[in-house]
């Protein structure tokens, strides 16, 4: 088992890395959403052909396939980053509680 200080350092570094990754995923998701919205607005201004709203909606969706794919990829990355961040936060909490327990145990033993 790792010494407590090493556990704290490792957990803190892991949490910092997870926070950086999460911030990047949030930014990438927002950018993918903006790209989709801009592309959709552009196509709507240009006009989408079709007999009715349903057909025009389907054609619009087909035209925006790449943008939707980018958004779904960004959503998946964001979900993963959130999970990794939560795990890192739990590991950090566990390391802190272990140190606190060790401190309490050491105080009682004296």
Label for each model-derived stretch:
Residues 1-4, 32, 39, 56-60, ...:
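Terminal low-complexity, poorly structured segments
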Residues 7, 45, 62-66:
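Generic detector of low-complexity/intrinsically disordered segments
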Residues 12, 61, 65-76:
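Extended, low-aromatic, Leu/Ala- and acidic/polar-enriched alpha-helical coiled-coil segments
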Residues 21-22, 26-35, 69-104:
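Long amphipathic alpha-helical coiled-coil segments
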């Amino acid at each position: 088992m790792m010494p407590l200080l090493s556990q704290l350092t490792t957990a803190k570094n892991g949490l910092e890395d997870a926070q950086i990754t999460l911030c990047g995923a949030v930014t990438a998701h927002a950018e993918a959403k903006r790209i989709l919205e801009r592309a959709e607005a552009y196509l709507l201004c240009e006009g989408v052909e079709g007999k009715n709203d349903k057909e025009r909606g389907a054609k619009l969706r087909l035209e925006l396939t790449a943008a939707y794919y980018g958004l779904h990829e960004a959503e998946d990355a964001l979900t993963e980053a959130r999970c990794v961040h939560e795990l890192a936060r739990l590991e950090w909490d566990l390391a802190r509680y272990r140190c606190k327990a060790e401190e309490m145990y050491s105080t009682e033993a004296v």
